[in-house]
Amino acid sequence: GSPIMADDPQEAEDIVSICSALVLNMGTPCERTFRSMLAAGKEANKRGKPVIFDPVGAGASAFRNELAATLLREVSLSVIKGNISEISFLTEGSGTTSGVDAHREALSTENNLNEHVRLAQRLSEKTGAVVAISGPIDIIADSREAWAVRNGHPAMAALSGTGCMSAAVIGCHAGANPQAPLLSCVCGMSGMGICGELAHER
């Protein structure tokens, strides 16, 4: 993919018109980006383009919570990708978000894998989106099917921004395969994990 970033409402619709997919990232929200994301999301829906939502920090502030709730309500999302804290908040209205990182004790492991799959599937049923939960084991699920992706390296957790990169990679796959959001998510998350493995080796 060839990326472009925009956050002004005046160009949101124009930028969406030339993109294959839209990634909405809640990393640095403000009133302007709130309006931009809403306008861009609605335009992408109108044009039938996949929308990937990365609810960075959902649950950390009332403003972020309002933005996330508005996007869930007013935009048809193809993919929601977040850490376990963010996905828990979107699903249940509660969580342990205190920054962009998930709390270590909440991360997906073999012991809680089924519980986290059910959480992802509940949010998928609620929104119609494929849900990806990033962590030591990445979980990708829709309401009928779930995948566990075990690629990656623990060092990736120490690098801020890898989650945002993953959302962009998913966007590239979804833009090329707009009718296959689940497969796009699996390819994006596993590909990002493989990149982390190779980077650590080098």
Residue ranges and their predicted role:
Residues 1-47, 53:
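Active-site cofactor/substrate anionic-group-binding motifs, chiefly glycine-
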Residues 2-4, 20-23, 49-52, 77-80, ...:
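Structural motif
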Residues 29-32, 57-61, 139, 156:
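Short, small-residue-enriched loops and turns at beta-alpha junctions
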Residues 33-82:
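Glycine/small-residue-rich loop that forms an oxyanion/phosphate-binding "nest" at active or ligand-binding sites
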Residues 64-146:
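Conserved phosphate/ATP/ADP-binding segment of small-molecule kinases
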Residues 89, 159-191:
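Short, small-residue alpha-helix embedded
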Residues 149-161:
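Short pre-catalytic strand/loop immediately N-terminal to key active-site residues, enriched for Gly-Thr
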Residues 194-202:
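Charged C-terminal helix
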